[in-house]
Amino acid sequence: MTIRDRDPLEVFSNSLVPMVVEQTARGERSFDIFSRLLQERIIFLTGPVYDQVSSLICAQLLYLESVNPTKEISFYINSPGGVVSAGLAIYDTMQYIRCPVSTVCIGQAASMGSLLLAGGEKGHRYALPNARVMVHQPSGGAQGQASDIEIQAREILIIRQRLNEIYREHTGQTLEQIEQKLERDSYLSANEAREFGLIDKVVERNPHETTPDPS
């Protein structure tokens, strides 16, 4: 997908990134807001999960591990989901790095977004009160020769089985319960997501300790 293929409003909105200006001993320094938050070990996933977004988030995770391999990373998710392979790249990187990754759902975590939410550090997976979570089985289309369609259908079934196993690992539900829940689009409130094991706590305030401003 190119920029031309995307919704013009989405492109316009994503280009409006606030800048933060800080005073230092060497003068003023300006950062875009996401770079400034990255300094505080905060990563954002907003919008669909596709390859470019996945690469950026994986790079941020690896960078923060290189800076401090034990300090927690906060991963905020507001996503309708997207490409399975791109989402699994983020998930695998979250599990690969040594840093604990806390996840926070703001707005929505649907499809692959919900898997990333559930894949956070156990005990540190949160959702805001009005967040929505949606889980379902992977979908896809196939075209070409009958043998090619058969191969693609078999691949989707393999992916579905793997996703079910990941959800089972992180929720504590049985495989049968996972399969039943993911059979169709299942929309969950924050409390329902907690009961199902996708998150650990519904929060109204930032669960992380803050450092008082010395000024």
Swiss-Prot record:
Coiled coil: none annotated. It is found in: Cytoplasm. PROSITE patterns: CLP_PROTEASE_HIS (PS00382), CLP_PROTEASE_SER (PS00381). It catalyses: Hydrolysis of proteins to small peptides in the presence of ATP and magnesium. alpha-casein is the usual test substrate. In the absence of ATP, only oligopeptides shorter than five residues are hydrolyzed (such as succinyl-Leu-Tyr-|-NHMec, and Leu-Tyr-Leu-|-Tyr-Trp, in which cleavage of the -Tyr-|-Leu- and -Tyr-|-Trp bonds also occurs). Fourteen ClpP subunits assemble into 2 heptameric rings which stack back to back to give a disk-like structure with a central cavity, resembling the structure of eukaryotic proteasomes. The keyword Hydrolase applies. CDD domains: S14_ClpP_2. Cleaves peptides in various proteins in a process that requires ATP hydrolysis. Has a chymotrypsin-like activity. Plays a major role in the degradation of misfolded proteins. Belongs to the peptidase S14 family. Its EC number is 3.4.21.92. Pfam families: CLP_protease. GO terms for molecular function: ATP-dependent peptidase activity; ATPase binding; serine-type endopeptidase activity. The lineage of its organism: Bacteria, Pseudomonadati, Pseudomonadota, Alphaproteobacteria, Acetobacterales. Keywords: Cytoplasm, Hydrolase, Protease, Serine protease. Gene3D superfamilies: 2-enoyl-CoA Hydratase, Chain A, domain 1 (3.90.226.10). This is ATP-dependent Clp protease proteolytic subunit 1. The active site is at residues 111, 136. The keyword Hydrolase applies. GO terms for cellular component: cytoplasm; endopeptidase Clp complex. One of its GO terms (biological process) is protein quality control for misfolded or incompletely synthesized proteins.
